[in-house]
Amino acid sequence: MFRGSTQLNLDSKGRLAIPAKYRNELFANCGGNIVVTADPSRCLLIYPQPVWEPIEKKLSGFSSFNPQIRSLQRLIIGNACDVEMDGSGRILISAPLRQFAGLQKEVVLAGQGEKFELWDMAKWDLEIDTATACKDGDIPPELEGFSL
């Protein structure tokens, strides 16, 4: 289970050092085999390969005759990259994915349960500002009655 956010730096080659607290779990659960893909929010999604596979299968199974579904398939599956964590716990983020998400040197790795989101730090700050600006009436019906 991945939770919390960590401020990190991409190195000059576009590699991301996965925080030590997650490395053992990733090596144990997926042998360090990871999938990185684009998200419509202009961040990147990072999945352990076994978590990604049923998502890809389900998304691929939807009809591509629906233009919205086809666009999502192109974005998410079409940009998916298999990467392997090296012995130092680093993964290479491809140049096209870095460009898509606007990643500069300073990034935020945000745990989201079974996956991570990778954000440019400035975009992450804006995302958090937007989330904290929500009014009580803005809560989706699915969360009504949910208490923290």
Curated annotation (Swiss-Prot):
Keyword line: Cytoplasm, DNA-binding, Repeat, Transcription, Transcription regulation
InterPro entries from the UniProt entry: MraZ, MraZ_C, MraZ_dom, MraZ_N, MraZ_sf, SpoVT-AbrB_dom, SpoVT-AbrB_sf
GO molecular function: DNA-binding transcription factor activity; transcription cis-regulatory region binding
Cellular component per GO, a single term: cytoplasm
Every SpoVT-AbrB domain range: 5-51, 80-123
Subcellular location: Cytoplasm, Nucleoid
UniProt-listed PROSITE patterns: SPOVT_ABRB (PS51740)
Presence of the UniProt keyword DNA-binding in the record: yes
Pfam families in the record: MraZ
Annotated signal peptide: none
A GO biological process held by the record: negative regulation of DNA-templated transcription initiation
Family of the protein in this entry: Belongs to the MraZ family.
Subunit and partners: Forms oligomers.
PANTHER family: TRANSCRIPTIONAL REGULATOR MRAZ
Protein name: Transcriptional regulator MraZ
Species of provenance: Nitrosomonas eutropha (strain DSM 101675 / C91 / Nm57)
